């Protein structure tokens, strides 16, 4: 019908064009046809409806739909509303009107009659459209109801675990002789479990409807306080519902350790029972909420969980005030406040704290006895106004229609999502201001504590991308240490900055404490004590407990990202609350601090972020200490090496890029990332502190640590915003450890491009083949082809001599030699102090001082004496250059400071604008809340939701627009660009992309600029590895494939399923497509790696052995990088590999040798390194690095890959021709030593159960070196 009409219309248009005289007749013809079609349809519908009596009477009638109405609606919707038709109708009608006036061939009557018919039909169709809207609402409501019923049934049948739990609790209760004090608890519990406690009977909460599943039952029990006796309605307003003496902490006994009350609405709430942290209770601060430092802080909660936990149902005034971050003005003055007196409070601070506990805690903190009247002992947030309203206002009558609302409707998160028809974005997307809790446009949900998140809202593997993550991750119970004794204090969010403690569904703040105290003056000692405690000491500490989903790939990007660097990636769905621009701006725009600068990355004066994401590597992170002075955050003891990446400069003052510490190209960690990007990566992971400030926080640390899982390579790739491609100068794209961010202060490279001029290359011709900027097989003509390998290993251990001489493998002896040399150096140290002090102005030697002393030996090396002279000259040149660089660095720093100031001002402006947005939004929301309360449930979704949705989106857009502006130059574009630009910021990728395959992947994905790099890199790497069984390498690849392919937690590493999950899921939140892309990329890359390996193998067979020695060394190194120390910055690898291949692909034989040599060295070297480093004073990063490889983490290939993923780039040698590049003498020697250490550390393979039989088969060829 539609086609016929449109055909007629187009034909009429063609005819009408040439001769306007035919206009009215054609209009008449078309309108007549339209009306005839409509009439025919209506007639047919009426005829057919006689046969559809059953359908109409039994089904359609309940929606007040008739078959005829349905057909009319279809006509109106599909035909009459057709844009083409609508655009032409006015013209046609005007033609008909024209026909009534001009006496055409047809009589006037014909036109006027037709016009009247048309107008009647149009009116009828408009009525039909309106009627259908009403019917549609009814149909939607019915569908919602059916869906909730089905979901409820499905849950009841599926969740056997809950039934078991319930049975267990019942048995426990019935068998246990209750102490008299516990009788009340036991009875209540049994009652609740057995009768499912019809909600109207619940004396403690006004919530009338609840999902019947056991999860909800238990949640209700936990939330409403089991031991509270029923409170009668006539209870005196001031009478306290609970007994004054704190009841035994039943909940603490029975509930899983770190479950915090789901009701806790503040972004920073944590499972801290108040008694344990009385300091958390602030003093009366007017009407400021206690745990939310500002109204804004709570917004995310309402945004994320309004649909899950309508906070308006809380009984306690304090809870309402605190949790919602709004005061008695909302919700009818003190009504909600009064609720508290009507019934026992639901403690929001902790699942285990009862009101009595709160009172006790308050008493403690304020110096009052626990029994003090509640008005006095109130949490600090209660303002006098609150108390007045509480005392004066009568108990609110809960809106009746709410009580009557479908009692059988399932209130679980998923059902609610479906039933409301709202995209969670409406609720979740914008950080809705606190008022939203009251208005939850959908059916209010139970403010319950869900013990079984997989039931509520957790869709397996997150197949439904829009749903928020599970409330508590299944690994919740994995780590007791985190629970009672050392609960973390809520984050010290400062009102102005922490606008949005993102309460992302995935990162439930109410469960994963924001690890810092709420008080601005919070001192680091608390942090130290917390983290120095069992939490950090627990070797198997599972970050999953408090970061359950945070690290899962997308979450890190999504929630966490939204948390810390909202702008880094556009939130995939409104699943992530738009991050507050100021948080990201603070770090991001204010001063693009190079991520190397550790404390910058981790904190801004008062904001401390736990680098504990490092814990994710499951390495024991013992004392992670925070030095409050200078807000400098140091991880002083064993922290997974990856944290070391961030340590490029420890303090702001010394943020200069030190040559030895992090040579330009050295794999110092995060390499060219524009300063903030990694922060985005690990933000959440790192910081259970959702304080946005911490946007920068330990991102760098996380990407490497948590990502140790093999499967992570991919994910991490996609979840690390790709660095912006640095400009390239000549063939070298930004050296990996050179920050490509032109604004990064203290770097010696301008515009992220390494300026070859900076190193004079005059005498570099014959220098070591291990120099920074050239790769082992550098094609540079100045490298002597026939020279034997002069790498650190060969030089130091004397196996660079005539080819016939077999290399010594007496590692014990080597270690001894090293030890002796070290002691000698230490004796000589005083002499060299002057020289070092000169350098200190430019370079921060604190971390490698001893190492440099050790390597800067005047002692003749076993190789050639001419080289010593050359080094001396080189050193002299370098000293001069360093003075120049120092001046430049100072100038740059000055510029940075100015720019930072400017950015701060911009941020403040943006902050103000954001505040205005929030206020406006909150006002609108409050209005809507009031309206919503009056409306019936069925009307609410259809009418309020659209508005909320719109508001939410506006708000989200507003908040996001700000972040995004600052974001771009900071590298948030990196996320999307990642695959293409990966080679530009290789080191970052390496850090993030765990297994070497990741490196290959990076290379492959690299954009054209670096394709050659990546090509070389892969082949070389692969060649080095492929000829051998390289079970390690392939293990990694396999894990990687599995992890990515399945998106499953394939990780075998100790970090438990949680870390594994993080790696694989990161992309999900980052971008809708991020995940698939990353995974396919990683798979493709692995495949590429294999194919390239094959090609190169062929190629290398053909190649001559001229460079065998050198290449051998480098390949060895490179391979070592790929394997035991994978993270070496890709840039490094790429450059090296580039050179390696360029000069001459390596012969296969050599690779084998390398393998073997590598294999043998690995074990002893580990010991050597571990022995040496401590004595060197290389405490932090190197030790972590070495420890990582020691037995603790070498359980299986996966954990090895984990180790590999985290290795500190700083400690990986650069595969470059040291001779062909002008590099500081010190740097060169550092490289030598790194090589030695790296080779030694490779012994880890043995512990990984590598099949050594293959290596032994090649012994014969090995001597041929």
From Swiss-Prot:
Residues 247-272, 331-407, 553-586, 626-674, 750-785, 822-841, 859-881, 893-1163 are annotated as: Disordered. Residues 255-271, 772-781 have a biased composition (Low complexity). Residues 893-905, 915-929 have a biased composition (Basic and acidic residues). The modification Phosphoserine is found at residues 293, 383, 642, 1129, 1144. It comes from the Eukaryota. Residues 107-142, 873-932, 1093-1118 form a coiled coil. Keywords: Coiled coil, Phosphoprotein. It holds the Pfam family FAM193_C. Residues 868-877, 931-940, 1149-1159 have a biased composition (Basic residues). Residues 355-365, 757-769 have a biased composition (Acidic residues). The keyword Lipid biosynthesis does not apply. Residues 953-973 have a biased composition (Polar residues). Belongs to the FAM193 family. PANTHER family: AGAP004327-PA, PROTEIN FAM193A. This is Protein FAM193A. The lineage of its organism: Eukaryota, Metazoa, Chordata, Craniata, Vertebrata. The gene is FAM193A.
């Amino acid at each position: 019908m539609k086609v016929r009409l449109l055909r007629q219309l187009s034909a009429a248009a063609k005819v009408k064009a040439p001769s306007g005289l035919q206009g009215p007749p054609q209009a008449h013809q078309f309108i007549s046809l339209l009306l005839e079609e409509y009439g025919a349809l209506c007639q047919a519908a009426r005829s057919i409806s006689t046969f559809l009596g059953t359908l109409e009477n039994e089904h359609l009638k309940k929606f007040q739909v008739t078959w005829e109405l349905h057909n009319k609606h279809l006509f109106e919707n599909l035909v009459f509303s057709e844009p083409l038709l609508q655009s032409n109708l006015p013209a046609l009608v005007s033609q008909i009107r024209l026909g009534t006036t001009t006496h055409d061939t047809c009589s006037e009557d014909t036109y006027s009659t037709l016009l009247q018919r048309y107008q009647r039909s149009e009116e009828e169709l408009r009525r039909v459209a309106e009627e259908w809207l009403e019917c549609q609402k009814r149909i939607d409501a019915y569908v919602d109801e059916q869906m909730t019923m089905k979901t409820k049934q499905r849950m009841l049948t599926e969740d056997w675990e809950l039934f078991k739990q319930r049975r267990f609790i019942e048995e426990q209760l019935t068998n246990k002789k209750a102490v008299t004090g516990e009788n009340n608890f036991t009875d209540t519990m049994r009652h609740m479990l057995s009768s499912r406690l019809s909600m109207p009977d619940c004396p403690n909460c006004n919530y009338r409807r609840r999902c019947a599943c056991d999860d909800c039952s238990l949640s209700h029990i936990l939330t409403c306080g089991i031991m509270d006796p029923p409170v009668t309605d006539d209870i005196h307003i001031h009478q306290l519902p609970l007994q004054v003496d704190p009841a035994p902490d039943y909940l603490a006994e029975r509930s899983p350790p770190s479950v915090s009350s789901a009701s806790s609405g503040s972004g920073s709430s944590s499972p801290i029972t108040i008694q344990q942290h009385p300091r958390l209770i602030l003093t009366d601060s007017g009407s400021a909420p206690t745990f939310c430092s500002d109204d804004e802080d709570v917004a995310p909660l309402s945004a994320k969980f309004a649909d899950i936990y309508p906070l308006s149902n809380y009984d306690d005034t304090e809870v309402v005030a605190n949790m919602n971050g709004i005061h008695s003005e909302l919700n009818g003055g003190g009504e909600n406040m009064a609720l508290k007196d009507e019934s026992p409070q639901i403690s929001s601070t902790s699942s285990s704290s009862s009101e009595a506990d709160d009172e006790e805690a308050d008493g403690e903190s304020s110096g009052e006895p626990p029994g003090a009247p509640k008005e006095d002992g109130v949490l600090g947030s209660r303002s006098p106004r609150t108390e007045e309203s509480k005392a004066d206002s009568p108990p609110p009558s809960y809106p009746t229609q709410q009580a009557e609302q479908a009692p059988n409707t399932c209130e679980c998160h998923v059902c609610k999502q479906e039933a409301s028809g709202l995209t969670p974005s409406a609720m979740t997307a914008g950080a809705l201001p606190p008022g939203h809790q009251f208005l939850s446009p959908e059916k209010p949900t139970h403010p319950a504590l869900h013990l079984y998140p997989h039931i509520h809202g957790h869709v397996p593997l997150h197949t439904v991308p829009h749903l928020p993550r599970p409330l508590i991750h299944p690994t919740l119970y994995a780590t007791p240490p985190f629970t009672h004794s050392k609960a973390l204090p809520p984050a010290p969010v400062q009102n102005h900055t922490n606008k949005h403690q993102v309460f992302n569904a995935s990162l439930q703040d109410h469960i994963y404490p924001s690890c810092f105290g709420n008080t601005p003056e919070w001192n680091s000692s608390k942090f130290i004590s917390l983290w120095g405690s069992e939490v950090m000491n627990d070797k198997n500490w599972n970050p999953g407990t408090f970061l359950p989903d945070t690290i899962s790939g997308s979450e890190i990007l999504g929630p966490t990202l939204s948390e810390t660097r909202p702008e880094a990636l556009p939130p995939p769905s409104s699943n992530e609350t738009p991050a507050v621009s100021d948080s990201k701006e603070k770090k991001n725009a204010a001063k693009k601090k190079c991520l190397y600068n550790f404390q910058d990355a981790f904190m801004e004066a008062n904001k401390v972020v736990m680098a504990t994401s490092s814990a994710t590597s499951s390495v024991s992170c013992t004392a992670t200490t925070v030095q409050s002075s200078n807000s400098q955050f140091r991880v002083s003891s064993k922290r997974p090496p990856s944290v070391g990446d961030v340590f490029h400069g420890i303090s702001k003052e010394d943020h200069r890029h030190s040559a030895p510490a992090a040579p330009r190209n050295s794999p110092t960690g995060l390499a060219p990332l524009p300063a903030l990007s990694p922060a985005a990566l690990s933000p959440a992971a790192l910081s259970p502190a959702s304080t946005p400030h911490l946007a920068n926080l330990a991102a760098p640390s996380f990407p490497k640590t948590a990502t140790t899982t093999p499967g992570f390579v991919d994910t991490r790739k996609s979840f690390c915003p790709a660095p912006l491609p640095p400009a390239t100068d000549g063939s070298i794209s930004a050296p990996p450890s050179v920050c490509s961010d032109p604004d990064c202060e203290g770097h010696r490279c301008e515009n992220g491009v390494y300026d070859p001029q900076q190193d004079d290359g005059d005498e570099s011709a014959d220098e070591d083949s291990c120099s920074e900027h050239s790769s082992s097989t550098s094609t540079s003509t100045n490298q002597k082809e026939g020279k034997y390998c002069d790498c650190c290993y060969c030089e130091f251990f004397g196996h660079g001599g005539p080819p016939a001489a077999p290399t010594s493998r007496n590692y014990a002896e080597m270690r001894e030699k090293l030890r002796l040399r070290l002691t000698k150096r230490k004796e000589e140290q005083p002499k060299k102090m002057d020289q070092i002090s000169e350098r200190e102005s430019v370079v921060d030697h604190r971390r490698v001082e001893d190492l440099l002393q050790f390597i800067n030996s005047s002692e003749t090396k076993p190789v050639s004496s001419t080289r010593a002279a050359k080094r001396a000259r080189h050193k002299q040149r370098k000293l001069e250059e360093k003075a120049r660089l120092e001046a430049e660095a100072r100038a740059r720093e000055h510029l940075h400071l100015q720019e930072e100031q400017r950015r701060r001002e911009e941020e403040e402006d943006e902050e103000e604008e954001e505040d205005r947005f929030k206020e406006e939004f909150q006002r609108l929301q409050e209005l809507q809340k009031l309206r919503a309360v009056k409306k019936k449930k069925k009307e609410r979704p259809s009418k309020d939701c659209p508005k909320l949705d719109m508001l939410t989106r506006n708000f989200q857009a507003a908040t996001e627009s700000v972040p995004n502006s600052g974001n771009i130059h900071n590298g948030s574009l990196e996320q999307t660009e990642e695959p293409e630009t990966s080679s530009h910021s290789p080191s970052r990728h390496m850090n993030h992309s765990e297994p070497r395959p990741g490196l290959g992947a990076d290379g492959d994905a690299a954009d054209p600029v670096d394709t050659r790099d990546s090509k070389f890199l892969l082949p070389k790497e692969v060649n080095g590895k492929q000829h051998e069984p390289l079970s390690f390498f392939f293990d990694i690849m396999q894990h990687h494939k599995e992890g990515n392919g399945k998106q499953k937690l394939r990780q075998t590493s100790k970090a438990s399923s949680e870390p594994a999950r993080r790696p694989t899921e990161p992309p999900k939140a980052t971008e809708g497509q991020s995940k698939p892309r990353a995974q396919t990329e990683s798979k493709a890359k692995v495949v590429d790696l294999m194919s390239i390996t094959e090609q190169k193998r062929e190629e290398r067979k053909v190649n001559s052995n001229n460079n065998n020695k050198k290449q051998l060394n480098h390949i060895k190194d490179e391979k070592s990088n790929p394997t035991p120390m994978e993270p070496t910055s890709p840039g490094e690898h790429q450059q090296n590999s580039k050179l390696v291949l360029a000069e001459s692909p390596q012969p296969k034989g050599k690779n084998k040798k390398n393998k073997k040599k590598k294999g043998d060295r690995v074990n002893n070297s580990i010991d050597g390194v571990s022995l040496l480093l401590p004595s060197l004073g290389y405490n932090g990063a190197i030790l972590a690095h070495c420890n990582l490889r020691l037995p603790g983490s070498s359980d299986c290939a996966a954990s090895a890959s984990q180790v590999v993923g985290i290795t500190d780039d700083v400690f990986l040698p650069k595969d470059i021709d040291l001779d062909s590049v002008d590099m500081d003498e010190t740097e060169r020697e550092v490289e030598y030593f790194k090589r030695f250490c790296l080779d030694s550390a490779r012994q880890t393979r043995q512990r990984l159960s590598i099949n050594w039989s293959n290596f032994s088969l090649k012994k014969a060829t090995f001597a041929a070196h």
